[in-house]
Amino acid sequence: MKAAVFEKAGQMVVDEVAKPTIQASDDVVIRVVRGCVCGSDLWSYKEGDEKEAYSVNSGHEAMGIVEEVGPDVTLVKPGDFVIAPFTHGCGHCAACLAGYDGTCENHPVPTNWSNGYQAQYIRFQYANWALIKVPGQPEDYSEGMLKSLLTLSDVMATGYHAARSANVQKGDKVVVIGDGAVGQCAVIAAKMRGASRIVLMSRHADR
């Protein structure tokens, strides 16, 4: 399959790499239909970010079609349209059960970010816990709606997590510092939670 490969700071290539396979009983393999570049991807692209030369891309926002499932997967089946969140846990440890799967105690790598999403196929771990099943198929949605759905893989969820962590409630006045994608999604989230006034602080007058 084709995948973006990090060669060195400032240089990415598209190369042929091995297609991922099922390795654990709750894995799925997903054919990516949409992916995007996060601001954090640019850290390693610009600076190297301690990445090894010719290593996996840092992409972590994607959605696609389930192609293969492990024997213990019950949430989805081949052919399902899903969103693959950037950070996810096992669903069983204390952190996950408390709602903080971003700090899962059982993720098999130092960070539970699922790198490598800028590829034709991805392997997704803990599919029963973290995959988001979307009704229908990609062709049922407009391009604009697909882009909106893709934000649920990271940036909108991150913005909502900020509003939830701040316990924004109906009638609250909220200040969001930073007008990047996450900040703007935090504004949306604060409005969803009933904030009466929202101030977005930034250096960009046009925003």
Identify the role of each PLM range.
Residues 18-35, 48-96, 115, 135-142:
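Glycine-rich beta-strand-centered segment in the early N-terminal region that forms part
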Residues 90-177:
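NAD(P)H dinucleotide-binding glycine-rich loop of Rossmann-like/cofactor-binding domains
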Residues 158, 182, 206:
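Hydrophobic/small residue at the entry helix of a nucleotide-binding pocket
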Residues 40-46:
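Cytochrome P450 core scaffold surrounding the K-helix E-X-X-R motif
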Residues 201-204:
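N-terminal Rossmann-fold cofactor-binding loop
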Residues 192-197:
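Conserved S-adenosyl-L-methionine
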